[in-house]
Amino acid sequence: MGRNDLIRRLPVYATGEHDCPYLDGETACTWFVDPDASLSPGLYSNLIRQGYRRSGRYIYRPGCDACHACQSLRIPVHRFRSRRRHRRCLKANAGATVEPLPSTYREEHYQLYCDYLQARHPGSEMSDPAIGDYLEFLRTDWCETLFYEFRDENDTLLGVAATDLVADGLSAVYTFYRPDLPERSLGTLAILWQINEARRLGLDYVYLGYWIKGCDQMRYKADFRPHEVFNGGRWLTVA
């Protein structure tokens, strides 16, 4: 049985309608693969290629009937062309170092994660994560996840990019970094590193998750060109 057949046989469940977190006035529905289903690195890789996304042990995709604004976006790393702002970012971080680490608990990482969420989501439930929730969100036991650790010239932690290794690329799960250093553009730096790392590993893509045209929170993803979006069951190139 091929992997596409296995995907079609996977039990998938839909949530009820809920407020869309990205588009004001819109409702959303999400399809989740049964978290108790038997998964493997190969099957997960194929789901990523079919426009799915991982959060902890949950694999999901948008399932809205009336709206198809959410599209998976990936960067073909061998065709990627850096722009002036990307080169400025690399210059600003010329002294930074990156080390791939196993996805295990480190107190320094967890504290940075808390600082990042408190800056991005002040006053919300997300801003005070428990240690167990932190690790459950970033990793799972049926795929290989690395924590790419970014440090500055003085060995001070700058950020962490939780990244899944899939068959044809790297999937950016979540990146958190120091919120007090906007001049370094650390989120952009992490993606540029993932692009170069995928090239070094002989992989083809960096998967950045979902993108919505016109959504300010996701605008940065489309800044990496060319990129591809998953639309109508196939990947389409956006130059």
Swiss-Prot record:
Keywords: Acyltransferase, Cytoplasm, Transferase. GO terms for molecular function: arginyl-tRNA--protein transferase activity; leucyl-tRNA--protein transferase activity. It comes from the Bacteria. GO terms for cellular component: cytoplasm. InterPro entries: Acyl_CoA_acyltransferase, Asp_Glu_LeuTrfase, N-end_Aminoacyl_Trfase, N-end_Aminoacyl_Trfase_C, N-end_Aminoacyl_Trfase_N. Belongs to the R-transferase family. Bpt subfamily. GO terms for biological process: ubiquitin-dependent protein catabolic process via the N-end rule pathway. This is Aspartate/glutamate leucyltransferase. Functions in the N-end rule pathway of protein degradation where it conjugates Leu from its aminoacyl-tRNA to the N-termini of proteins containing an N-terminal aspartate or glutamate. It is found in: Cytoplasm. Its main location: cytoplasm. Pfam families: ATE_C (PF04377), ATE_N (PF04376). Its EC number is 2.3.2.29. It catalyses: N-terminal L-glutamyl-[protein] + L-leucyl-tRNA(Leu) = N-terminal L-leucyl-L-glutamyl-[protein] + tRNA(Leu) + H(+); N-terminal L-aspartyl-[protein] + L-leucyl-tRNA(Leu) = N-terminal L-leucyl-L-aspartyl-[protein] + tRNA(Leu) + H(+). NCBIfam families: PRK01305.1-1, PRK01305.1-3, PRK01305.2-3.
